[in-house]
């Protein structure tokens, strides 16, 4: 990766005793910054406008709240680097600044930054899952190929906005006439949606299953009484504890995904990521999406910890705390460059 030497050199100039953790004031910022403060780091939130900034200023664990320039995020990133800050990406960051700016932002960024480019393209995302040997839904290139119910998804981190389902090729062809953005057509899967939270740890040289959630989507999960068109805009998340017999498969998929990222994308993924799936009634798991960074579903155990974190640390820990723990231990062990790109 072209960016890695630059970020590596930048980190060498950091005062690691005064490290700050920063993120965009949205999505999982409260969880991330609360965890960072609990582990003794300075904290910075970058807000999209003064009204948002005012909300985040009420929290004592956030040391500084800035109003950022998201149209030209490079300036904000340079200011973060000048303040000895590392950056934690999440879905709102990707949506606000776009993957191109995110790739070029001159601030050490947790995880595999190049993976953001792949996340922006639904076809590349599915090809990566396929390379990992993970079961995926059938993908259709045109409406004429469709043989049953499908779901149409727009590119990018949009929280389900603009997604729709169609029962057959005729309905699909009609509805696609109104779509003006890039999209992918996937086989519609029947079963239970489940979103798996993982943490890839360079410090401990292991992959951790950290939690799971179900998304609550409007208005497919709302009170529509059959009067409204199903939509998939995410409004919140519900906790989920998985059948223990499913965990080995879920863990294996995570391992396979990490290997595929390293081989295809060219960098090792450190920190949180998510595989998004349907569990069918025969207990098979089909993965239809991934997020190569922290997901909002981890907010379900903010403050009291993931039910799976006790398996690794013998104490409850939420994902914000887990990120901070990894960074603190990486500083102690001289492995900080393994976390950031």
Swiss-Prot record:
Which pathway does it take part in? Purine metabolism; IMP biosynthesis via de novo pathway; 5-formamido-1-(5-phospho-D-ribosyl)imidazole-4-carboxamide from 5-amino-1-(5-phospho-D-ribosyl)imidazole-4-carboxamide (formate route): step 1/1
Domain spans labelled ATP-grasp: 113-328
Query: PROSITE patterns annotated for this entry?
Result: ATP_GRASP
Q: Which reaction does it catalyse?
A: 5-amino-1-(5-phospho-beta-D-ribosyl)imidazole-4-carboxamide + formate + ATP = 5-formamido-1-(5-phospho-D-ribosyl)imidazole-4-carboxamide + ADP + phosphate
Give the first-level EC class, as a single word: ligase
Q: Keyword annotations for this protein? A: ATP-binding, Ligase, Magnesium, Manganese, Metal-binding, Nucleotide-binding, Purine biosynthesis
GO BP of this protein:
'de novo' IMP biosynthetic process
What Enzyme Commission number(s) apply to this enzyme?
A: 6.3.4.23
What are the names of the required cofactors?
Mg(2+); Mn(2+)
List ligand-binding residues for Mg(2+).
276, 289
The positions annotated for binding 5-amino-1-(5-phospho-beta-D-ribosyl)imidazole-4-carboxamide are 27, 92, 237
For this chain's record, the cofactor binding note is: Binds 1 Mg(2+) or Mn(2+) ion per subunit.
- Family as reported in the entry's similarity comment: Belongs to the phosphohexose mutase family.
Question: What is the protein name stated in its UniProt record?
Answer: 5-formaminoimidazole-4-carboxamide-1-(beta)-D-ribofuranosyl 5'-monophosphate synthetase
Q: What is the lineage of its organism?
A: Archaea, Thermoproteota, Thermoprotei, Thermoproteales, Thermoproteaceae
């Amino acid at each position: 990766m072209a960016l890695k030497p630059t970020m590596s050199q930048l980190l060498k100039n950091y005062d690691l005793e005064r490290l700050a953790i920063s993120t965009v004031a949205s999505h999982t910022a409260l969880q991330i910054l609360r965890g960072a403060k609990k582990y003794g780091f300075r904290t910075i939130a970058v807000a999209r406008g003064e009204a948002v900034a005012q909300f985040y200023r009420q929290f004592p664990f956030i040391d500084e709240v800035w109003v950022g320039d998201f149209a030209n995020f490079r300036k904000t990133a340079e200011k973060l680097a000048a303040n000895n800050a590392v950056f934690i990406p999440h879905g709102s960051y990707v949506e606000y600044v776009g993957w191109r700016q995110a790739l070029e932002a001159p601030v050490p960024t947790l995880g595999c930054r190049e993976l953001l480019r792949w996340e922006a393209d639904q076809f590349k995302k599915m090809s990566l899952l396929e390379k990992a040997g993970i079961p995926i839904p059938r993908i259709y290139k045109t409406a004429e190929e469709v043989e049953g119910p499908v779901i149409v998804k727009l590119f990018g981190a949009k929280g389900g906005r603009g997604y729709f389902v169609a029962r057959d090729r005729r309905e699909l062809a009609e509805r696609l006439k109104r779509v003006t953005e890039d999209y992918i057509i996937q086989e519609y899967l029947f079963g239970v949606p489940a979103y798996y939270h993982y943490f890839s740890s360079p410090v401990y040289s292991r992959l951790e299953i950290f939690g799971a959630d179900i998304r609550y989507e409007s208005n497919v999960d709302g009170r529509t009484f059959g009067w409204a068109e199903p939509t998939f805009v995410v409004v919140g998340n519900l906790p989920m504890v998985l059948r223990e017999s499913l965990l080995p498969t879920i863990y294996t998929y995570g391992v396979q995904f990490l290997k595929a990222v390293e081989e295809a994308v060219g960098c090792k993924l450190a920190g949180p990521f998510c595989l998004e799936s349907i569990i069918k009634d025969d207990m098979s798991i089909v993965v239809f999406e991934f997020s190569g960074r922290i997901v909002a579903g981890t907010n379900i155990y903010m403050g009291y910890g993931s039910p799976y974190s006790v398996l690794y640390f013998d104490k409850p820990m939420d994902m914000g705390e887990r990120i901070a723990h990894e960074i603190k231990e990486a500083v102690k062990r001289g492995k900080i460059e393994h976390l950031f790109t």
